[in-house]
């Protein structure tokens, strides 16, 4: 069907069709993503409410389902106030620089064997490079606001994000070693072979089982990378009010939160792709194979995102020195040790990734 539509568009628009086709694919990717981001805010409030034995939002629309729309309307019509002493150009650039990497990184995420906006050979490298740019938006926002609270929040954010990017990067390098490729589609397909996969137990052949400590390091680093609880000292309300976002209002303020929730979904989707078999069904059966791969990817991503929310409703906030100690003295040494262990494992007769 997609190929027929592509051929029809090519015959209709000729040389302009590739540009139009890419724009259609971008809109088809970004529009559902923004819808997921909006309703993730509702799911977070509902999940935390149930954890605390209360109903959560239930006033706007049936069962509170229109709450994200009400929030969006409220923020759209709020004024964006520019502080007098702020650098106005950089002040407005900060939110854009924060949300753009969270959206651009999705172009290499595979939703199926041949379903990706850009199935490039260096997909994992591209994703790691593009997501590392988000820290610049936070630094620009903190610097341009000309506020001591915003500047302190930006300093905290940059140090925390850079620290945990190292641990997360090493964790992904371990997956790269066992997969032998940077192509994210091939990384998923590589998890569909082995003794357990031959038995139909696909979920036991995924990377989470042999690389379980690395999976845990990746998940916790993802919490810190997205400034989620218990690593949310960047916007610690009791210390620096709202951190680098303190001077923002309206849609400029909303873009920071859109970026945070989009990054949560991206980190979760990357965890699913690297460790949980991507679009592959957990069991090789007629019923499970009938379900489209993008639904499996979405369900697994939903479970991982819910783990983010569960952590928020369970653990207290860490002190900043505890966060730095965890990243530099525990996670980075663990990932370095596992790099050596996996390297020796691959060269041994017990290599399970052949």
Swiss-Prot record:
InterPro entries: NADH_UbQ_OxRdtase_su1/FPO, NADH_UbQ_OxRdtase_su1_CS. The gene is nuoH. This is NADH-quinone oxidoreductase subunit H. Its EC number is 7.1.1.-. NDH-1 shuttles electrons from NADH, via FMN and iron-sulfur (Fe-S) centers, to quinones in the respiratory chain. The immediate electron acceptor for the enzyme in this species is believed to be ubiquinone. Couples the redox reaction to proton translocation (for every two electrons transferred, four hydrogen ions are translocated across the cytoplasmic membrane), and thus conserves the redox energy in a proton gradient. This subunit may bind ubiquinone. GO terms for molecular function: NADH dehydrogenase activity; oxidoreductase activity, acting on NAD(P)H, quinone or similar compound as acceptor; quinone binding. Pfam families: NADHdh. It catalyses: a quinone + NADH + 5 H(+)(in) = a quinol + NAD(+) + 4 H(+)(out). GO terms for biological process: aerobic respiration. It is found in: Cell inner membrane. Its main location: membrane. NDH-1 is composed of 14 different subunits. Subunits NuoA, H, J, K, L, M, N constitute the membrane sector of the complex. Belongs to the complex I subunit 1 family. The chain crosses the membrane at residues 12-32, 62-82, 89-109, 124-144, 162-182, 203-223, 239-259, 263-283, 291-311, 326-346. NCBIfam families: PRK06076.1-2, PRK06076.1-3. PANTHER family: NADH DEHYDROGENASE SUBUNIT 1, NADH-UBIQUINONE OXIDOREDUCTASE CHAIN 1. It is a multi-pass membrane protein. PROSITE patterns: COMPLEX1_ND1_2. Keywords: Cell inner membrane, Cell membrane, Membrane, NAD, Quinone, Translocase, Transmembrane, Transmembrane helix, Ubiquinone. GO terms for cellular component: plasma membrane.
């Amino acid at each position: 069907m997609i190929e027929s539509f592509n051929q029809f568009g090519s015959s209709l628009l000729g040389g302009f069709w590739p540009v139009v086709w890419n724009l259609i694919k971008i809109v088809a990717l970004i529009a559902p993503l923004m819808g997921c981001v909006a309703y993730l805010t509702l799911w977070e409030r509902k999940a935390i409410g149930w954890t605390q034995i209360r109903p959560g939002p239930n006033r706007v629309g049936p069962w509170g389902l229109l709450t994200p729309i009400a929030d969006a309307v409220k923020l759209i019509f709020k004024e964006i106030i520019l502080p007098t002493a702020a650098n106005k150009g950089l002040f407005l650039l900060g939110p854009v620089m924060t949300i753009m990497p969270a959206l651009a990184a999705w172009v290499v995420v595979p939703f199926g064997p041949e379903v990706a906006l850009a199935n490039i050979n260096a997909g994992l490298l591209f994703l790691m490079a593009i997501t590392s740019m988000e820290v610049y938006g936070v630094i620009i926002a903190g610097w341009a606001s000309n506020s001591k609270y915003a500047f302190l929040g930006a300093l905290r954010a940059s140090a925390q994000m850079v620290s945990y990017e190292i641990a997360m990067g090493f964790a992904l390098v371990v997956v790269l070693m066992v997969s032998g490729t940077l192509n994210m589609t091939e990384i998923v397909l590589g998890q569909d072979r082995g003794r357990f996969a031959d038995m139909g137990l696909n979920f036991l052949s995924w990377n989470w089982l042999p690389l379980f400590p690395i999976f845990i390091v990746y998940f916790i680093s993802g919490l810190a990378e997205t400034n989620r609880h218990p690593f949310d000292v960047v916007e610690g309300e009791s210390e620096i009010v709202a951190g680098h976002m303190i001077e923002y209002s309206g849609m400029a303020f909303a873009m920071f939160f859109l970026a945070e929730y989009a990054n949560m979904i991206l980190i979760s989707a990357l965890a699913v792709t690297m460790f949980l078999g991507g679009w592959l069904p957990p069991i090789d059966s007629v019923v499970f194979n009938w379900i489209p791969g993008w639904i499996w990817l979405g369900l697994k991503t939903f479970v991982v995102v819910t783990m983010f929310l569960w952590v928020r409703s369970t653990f207290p906030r860490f002190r900043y020195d505890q966060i730095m100690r965890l990243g530099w003295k525990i996670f980075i040494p663990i990932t370095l040790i596992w790099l050596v262990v996996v390297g020796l494992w691959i060269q041994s007769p017990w290599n399970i990734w052949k």
